[in-house]
Amino acid sequence: LGHAYSALLAYDMAMAEGGEFLLRIEDIDKSRARPAWEAQIYKDLEWLGLWWPKPVMRQSDRLSVYQERLQNLWKRQYLFSCTCSRRDVQEAASAPQEGAAPLVGPDGILYPGTCRENRSFAIGPTLPTDAALRLWMERAATMAGEIHENGKVISFTETGRGPNGETGLIAFTAEEVIQTIGDVVLARRDMGTSYHLSVVLDDAAQGVTHVVRGEDLFEATKIHVILQRLLRLPTPIYHHHRLIRDENGKRLAKRDDARALSKYRAEGATPNDIRRLVGLPVA
């Protein structure tokens, strides 16, 4: 239901503005990409009455584009290589000398800077293939602020609401994202890219003007805006929406099969029934 709500809301907003609803297959993580799952996406969206331009953009076809932009950021010393595993990050951030419980950002526990301290930046003309690549947030956010037309304040326009009701012009500083987001991974060792980098480049390539997505991605938008500044790409208008939750207030997860659209459909539900369930106007 959560994905249905997001897709229906985006579709309704696009139609109201005379725009296009775009579908993109984000399949860079092969452990979560299956032909059967992709086919189910098409089936569900078509059943809901949604239409989109074809062929759809597929991220797995654009790996060379992501590598090219990573190379650009690497040469400009916005990236550093990192060999830390998730366990390494958790243990370092939870070490006794760190004091309080580790801070958590959009990608989980904030990276404590282990490999950054080694200053493993642009050494050699090619990207390292034996390590992840992290964004050096201090340098990146500082430069993004200088590039921005309003001085050192970085901003984007929000027409929905963040998790704490944030709306309108959302402004933030380099100091804020250094402390609350940190050095995020831009290229995983096993896939050569990341969600953050890929969606920024894909949105620009598709000419996306409005991004509609869940409020759980609100903080990640700050990462995306910084990348847009560094790569000289346009910043869309963002609309973050509420999350669909169960009767106990728990967010519905992808694995919550009990609320899969196919089951509602098999039980005789109509697309307008789904709209009513998620609180959207019927078509």
Identify the meaning behind each predicted range.
Residues L1-A100, E215-L233, N248:
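N-terminal Rossmann-like or analogous alpha/beta NTP/dinucleotide-binding catalytic cores
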Residues P53-P55, T235-Y238, N272-I274:
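Short, surface-exposed acidic
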Residues D61-R76, E98-D107, T129-A132, R139, ...:
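Short secondary-structure transition/capping segments
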Residues R62-Q67, H240-L243, R251-K254, L277-A283:
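Noncatalytic linker/hinge segments flanking ATPase motor cores
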Residues D88-A253, A260-R265:
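Active-site cores that bind ATP or allylic diphosphates and position pyrophosphate for catalysis
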Residues A266-V282:
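Extended, charge-rich low-complexity interaction segments
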